[in-house]
Curated annotation (Swiss-Prot):
Isomerizes 5-N-alpha-glycinylthymidine (Nalpha-GlyT) into 5-Calpha-glycinylthymidine (Calpha-GlyT) as a step in the pathway leading to thymidine hypermodifications in the viral genome. As a final result of the pathway of hypermodification, 5-aminoethyl-2'-deoxyuridine (5-NedU) substitutes for about 30% of thymidines in the viral DNA. These modifications probably prevent degradation of viral genome by the host restriction-modification antiviral defense system. InterPro entries: MJ0683-like, rSAM. One of its GO terms (molecular function) is metal ion binding. GO terms for biological process: symbiont-mediated evasion of host restriction-modification system; symbiont-mediated suppression of host innate immune response. It comes from the Viruses. Residues 457-480 are annotated as: Disordered. It catalyses: 5-N(alpha)-glycyl-dTMP in DNA + AH2 + S-adenosyl-L-methionine = 5-C(alpha)-glycyl-dTMP in DNA + 5'-deoxyadenosine + L-methionine + A + H(+). Keywords: Host-virus interaction, Inhibition of host innate immune response by virus, Iron, Iron-sulfur, Isomerase, Metal-binding, Restriction-modification system evasion by virus, Viral immunoevasion. Iron-sulfur cluster binds at residues 125, 129, 132. This is Radical SAM Nalpha-GlyT isomerase.
Length: 480
């Protein structure tokens, strides 16, 4: 996949327009874009091409609200994606919501096991998916068409992990693709992942681009590490329209075959399924191609969009697939769900999941859902909305294989597996153990939305009471 060649095409995609805006040699509006300049860059040791630009931090910002930034365009006569540098990386964190989340307009966490969310690159993603929530954001650099690059990301991750006594697998990344071409310059994903692996922690990557050899090498260093790709149709032509900046579908299948040949667990996010554009037959064909190369696990999620940007997504689908197929989609895209999300009608989703789970099982793959909710049944005590996750899953955890938590007493020691971790992860650990987390921790056993201060605490079993009674569960104290 020649990423730069795609960005130079004239198909009117937003990613292409943003790229050409910053790359044009002689802009008409000098007050917004300065001339292209060159300098020796001490960070990379290369000759950098850049220009100053005024950008807004919200879409359609007023001129007086724009700020001047330095936009890097290339190095050593090689053109890269327009990007800026930022000094501070986003703090490492867990999932966004608690298991018991009753906030109005929100929804409870469906994720079985913990993960540490990373962001080696932020802002805009040039893979250009029709359904992308990242590029549809209204605030920050994602609204400018610029990628944001945290400087010395690997060192910043090392520093954050150096203060942590508890961790989970490092997730690279739920935001922009971790293997964007500028990774060849900055190595943020590689160095961030190395920081986890060197401490004995597992990692996983999620990408629509090609896995570099170093990523495969890192995955092989921990038995709990695994590879993910995001593939949402078995139709090669439609795949290119859905994710025009991605590598070809066949290239993905070939890479999955190689990952499995090297003994790496593969967990494919069939995400998001866009009915009307993607048919049941397309999903069946994708499953067959995945199973043929030994894939382990599939995670299926139907498309959803925030109320504010759903119209923009529909417009992109109309442009790429035409009115007839887009209407077939919008006829099903009718459910207003918890979390201020619009999604596919529940009866269609439930029936499809049951069918897809059957197919996956027949083909030798385990199955799970992701952020799929149904309405609670009146009179049963169920909440207004609840996750379908446990009803549909055939694996240990929603990402497939069991991946435990890790902890350590001393900060100068590698992390060690929490042996008490249940196959289901933290989400259902206490549910299956008479309401008691197996590790004894009220914090980690409650499947909360963990943040940096939480990871400074240690996980350890609470010793039994001296009188031989049941183990007492107490909050774990922070060690400074």
């Amino acid at each position: 996949m020649d990423h730069a060649a795609w960005l130079n095409e004239e198909t009117g995609e937003a990613a292409q327009e943003a790229y050409k805006y910053f790359m044009r040699p002689d802009p008409n509006q000098r007050e917004f874009l300065g001339p292209i300049e060159e300098e020796d860059d001490p960070l990379t040791g290369m000759r950098a091409k850049f220009r100053m630009a005024k950008v807004g931090m919200v879409r359609n910002a007023k001129d007086e609200d724009k700020k001047e930034v330095k936009v890097y365009l290339g190095f050593n006569d090689v053109t890269y994606l327009p990007h800026i540098r930022i000094p501070n990386a986003k703090p490492l964190q867990g999932w966004y919501q608690d298991k018991h989340n009753d906030k109005r307009g929100s929804r409870a966490r469906p994720c079985f096991s913990e993960a540490i969310l990373t962001e080696p690159y932020g802002g805009y993603c040039t893979v250009g998916c029709a359904f992308c929530y990242v590029n549809s954001g209204f605030r920050g650099y994602r609204g400018t068409g610029l990628i944001s690059v945290p400087v010395n990301y690997g060192e910043q991750v090392r520093n954050m992990l150096s203060k942590s006594r508890t961790s989970a697998a490092g997730y690279f990344s739920s935001f922009t693709d971790p293997f964007l071409p500028i990774e060849d310059v900055y190595h943020n994903t590689q160095q961030g992942a190395e920081a986890f692996v060197e401490l004995g922690l597992p990692i996983f990557f999620l990408s629509r681009l090609s896995y570099p050899s170093w990523a495969i090498d890192l995955l092989k260093r921990n038995p709990y590490s695994y590879a993910q790709k995001s593939l949402n149709t078995g139709n090669d032509r439609d795949w290119h329209k859905l994710s025009p900046g991605a590598i070809s579908l066949q290239d993905h299948i070939d890479e999955i075959a190689e990952l499995r040949r090297q003994g790496i667990y593969t967990s494919i996010q069939v995400n998001p399924v866009v009915p009307g554009i993607v048919t049941h037959d397309d999903i069946r064909h994708l499953f067959e191609r995945l199973a043929a190369v030994g894939n382990n696990h599939v995670i299926v999620k139907f498309v959803e969009a925030g109320y504010s940007w759903a119209p923009a997504m529909i417009e992109r689908l109309h442009k790429r697939f035409g009115p007839e197929r887009t209407k077939a989609f919008t006829d099903l895209f009718t459910e207003n769900q918890a979390g201020a999300q619009k999604t596919i009608a529940e009866p269609y989703r439930v029936e499809a999941h049951q069918l897809y789970r059957k197919w996956a099982t027949e083909l030798g793959m385990t199955y799970a859902t992701c952020y799929e909710y149904r309405r609670g049944k009146p009179g049963t005590g169920e909440p207004a909305w609840l996750s379908m996750g446990r009803e549909m899953i055939t694996a240990d955890q929603c990402h497939g294989q069991r991946v435990p938590m890790f902890t350590r007493t001393d900060l100068d020691q590698p992390f060690q597996e929490v042996k008490e971790c249940a196959p289901t992860g933290c989400l259902h650990c206490a549910d299956d153990n008479e309401g008691k987390p197996r590790c004894g921790s009220e914090l980690f056993g409650a499947a909360k939305a963990l943040r940096s201060p939480d990871f400074k605490k240690i996980v350890e079993p609470t010793p039994p009471e001296e009188d031989g009674g049941e183990r007492k569960i107490i909050p774990i104290t922070q060690i400074d």
